[in-house]
């Protein structure tokens, strides 16, 4: 998901900014369990001005707000994020309007294995064929909701398999399905001679399959059917 930063300097003058509020906290105990959280609020009071054609606004305040809470321990992590964007900031796509819990996960680790169930972000290699991330200021959040398994058989070798649906605003039923596998090998971690010489050598391989259903694009008086491949594979 993305939006175009459409607030030009002239248009920005028609808005009274609410000071951005962002607070983070960390609470830890002697039992090895820690809690991390944050709250963020960005808002504007829109003012209508016919001279610069700001248009009409249905609400007295426009804002995006987020609240995160994560529990971290030796073997199990869990967390969730609540978003309230009922009246999103100008420049964000209308489909952003809404609220809910778009990110919730549980992660377990044991003897080289790491299993995640829920929403997560991942990047294979340089991110050429798979990169999911969140950038709130740009309106980007393409997280994957599903499962991911990581395995490190030896130091320097990392294997990953995953599958799930990609976030599309607030409707996961219309989201595309993503499946993938990745292998990364850090040669210098396997070779003492390379480490002694200060050399670094990494090799990797990735495979991603994306599945999307057919789409009907409705136009006045016509019905266009978009013919695209349902399954698109990629290698890197």
Q: Could you describe each region identified by the protein language model?
A:
Residues 1-5:
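Positively charged n-region of N-terminal signal peptides that target proteins for export
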Residues 8-19:
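Bacterial N-terminal signal peptides
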Residues 21-24:
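Signal peptide processing junction and immediate N-terminal pro/mature segment
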Residues 26-63, 71-101, 109, 135-236:
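Signature for the C-terminal beta-barrel architecture of outer-membrane proteins
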Residues 87, 113, 122-124:
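A short acidic, glycine/proline-enriched capping/turn motif at secondary-structure boundaries
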Residues 117:
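Conserved, mostly hydrophobic/aromatic
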Residues 121-128, 132:
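Surface-exposed extracellular loop regions of Gram-negative outer-membrane beta-barrel proteins
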């Amino acid at each position: 998901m993305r939006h175009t930063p459409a607030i030009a300097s002239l248009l920005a003058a028609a808005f009274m900014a609410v000071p951005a509020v962002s607070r983070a906290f960390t609470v830890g105990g002697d039992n090895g369990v820690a809690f991390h959280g944050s709250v963020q609020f960005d808002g504007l009071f829109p003012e209508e001005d016919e001279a610069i054609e700001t248009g009409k606004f249905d609400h007295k305040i426009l804002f995006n707000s987020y609240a995160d809470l994560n529990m971290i321990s030796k073997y199990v992590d869990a967390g969730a994020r609540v978003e309230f964007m009922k009246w999103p900031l100008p420049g964000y796509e209308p489909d952003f309007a809404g609220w809910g819990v778009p990110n919730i996960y549980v992660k377990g680790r044991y003897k080289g294995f790491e299993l995640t169930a829920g929403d997560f972000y991942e990047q294979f290699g340089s991110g050429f064929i798979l990169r999911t991330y969140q950038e709130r200021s740009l309106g980007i959040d393409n997280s994957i909701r599903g499962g991911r398994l990581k395995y490190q058989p030896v130091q320097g070798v990392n294997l990953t398999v995953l599958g799930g649906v990609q976030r599309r605003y607030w409707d996961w039923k219309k989201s595309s399905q993503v499946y993938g596998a990745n292998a990364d090998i850090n040669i210098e971690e396997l070779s003492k001679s390379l480490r002694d010489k200060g050399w670094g050598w990494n090799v990797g391989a990735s495979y991603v399959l994306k599945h999307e259903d057919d789409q009907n694009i409705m136009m006045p008086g016509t019905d266009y059917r978009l013919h695209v491949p349902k399954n698109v594979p990629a290698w890197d």
